[in-house]
Amino acid sequence: MVFFRSVSAISRLRSRAVQQSSLSNSVRWLHSSELDLKSQMQEIIPEQQDRLKKLKSEQGKVPVGNITVDMVLGGMRGMTGLLWETSLLDADEGIRFRGMSIPECQKILPSAESGEEPLPESLLWLLLTGKVPTKEQANALSTELAHRAAVPAIDALPSTAHPMTQFASGVMALQVQSEFQKAYEQGDISKSKYWEPTFEDALNLIARVPVVASYVYRRMYKDGSIIPLDDSLDYGANFSHMLGFDSPQMKELMRLYVTIHSDHEGGNVSAHAGHLVGSALSDPYLSFAAALNGLAGPLHGLANQEVLLWIKLVVEECGESISKEQLKDYVWKTLNSGKVVPGYGHGVLRKTDPRYICQREFALKHLPDDPLFQLVSKLYEVVPPILTELGKVKNPWPNVDAHSGVLLNYYGLTEARYYTVLFGVSRSLGICSQLIWDRALGLPLERPKSVNMDWLDNFTRLNR
């Protein structure tokens, strides 16, 4: 068996690669004056195509990891095997969008006139171009998305189905409008131009998913009274408005929510599913619908609703004024019964999720006296030491799901069953951005090699 480098050496190289990636991306945080996003992409894509060709020809045989039997048996966890340009996840620092941390995004990206949180449109511009947009560019993109947001009637959906089932079905219903499928079937488009109809589909899809998602919400929980889109509002504010929440703070929360949930590199189930299906040249509607079906799984996108339900169970059994000592006992009882504390731990992160921290800062500013937020704060103090003492958890710290439900609940969006739909709307920005780059870079059909246990037994026996 050939071991290219030790695991520790690979780990050091990966850490250095993350640092270098952040450094190289920082160079691209420069503004440009072009207001049209597609024109920006037309300038950038040829440079990145050349970069990929050079990387493949000059460094194509350089090993980037050491595959172990554990990785094969463990769902490929930790295996480096996917190109994902829009974001990179570091175990210590958390997610970086094109090299920018969440605090940097909050500080640098344009916000609404009356708000402080980044506009999702400004993050979308960053994800696609690697450049920070001007306020004018973000506003222009906001206007463009509003103009693209027309959605055909989807009343055939059963109103009793799970919100995610309705949401994914609604996205599939939009697929008949795919520009990519139309161009491919006509056969008059070259491979180098695949990204252009993909761009049209991606922006149309990003524009339309809040309309579909709010339609599902109003249909299920508000007697079907639909609130039309207001093209004077930005993306996050419009989504909040169409759901039926028009307070300035809820609109600000929605901007923050969409931004921090937009992307989390390419290895998670929804991102990988979207990339995998897209690699077959399925259009963005089909690819994103596949991503949503992955997101609907209990091990991926349902955690945010499970956290809120668990917190409400704590209140129901122990009261809102539960002390830290009582809370410790409750957490131990939960763990000793074979259950987990939802919202704690992460497959990659080894510190508190920065997405949790920025939500906590929002709560400290806007709802410091809310009883459920105070309970979340107590859990932040109580749970990590207990999980550390337990000794079976690599990351005892809270993740993004530990906080989001309490914020949404405070502003009146109390239907926890719907929360994964909000997650899905947010993920459209990252997944669709990467689909454009997948086609722009000409990435191939994904087709990993699989083996059986006999193969693994024989291989390990020969290489002991």
From Swiss-Prot:
SUPFAM superfamilies xrefs: Citrate synthase (SSF48256)
Q: State its location(s).
A: Mitochondrion matrix
| Annotated protein name in UniProt | Citrate synthase 5, mitochondrial
Q: Name one GO molecular function term.
A: citrate (Si)-synthase activity
Reactions catalysed: oxaloacetate + acetyl-CoA + H2O = citrate + CoA + H(+)
- Quick one: a GO biological-process term for this protein? tricarboxylic acid cycle
Q: In which pathway does it act?
A: Carbohydrate metabolism; tricarboxylic acid cycle; isocitrate from oxaloacetate: step 1/2
E.C. number? 2.3.3.16
Q: What class of enzyme is it?
A: transferase
Q: Where is the transit peptide?
A: 1-25
Tell me its family: Belongs to the citrate synthase family.
Q: Which residues form the signal peptide?
A: none
Instruction: Report which gene this protein is encoded by.
Output: CSY5
Going by the UniProt record, its keywords in alphabetical order are: Mitochondrion, Transferase, Transit peptide, Tricarboxylic acid cycle
For this record, an example GO cellular component is: mitochondrial matrix
Q: Which domain of life is it from?
A: Eukaryota
Misc. comment: Citrate synthase is found in nearly all cells capable of oxidative metabolism.
Q: Entry's Pfam families?
A: Citrate_synt (PF00285)
Residues at the active site: H300, H346, D401
Where does the protein principally reside? mitochondrion
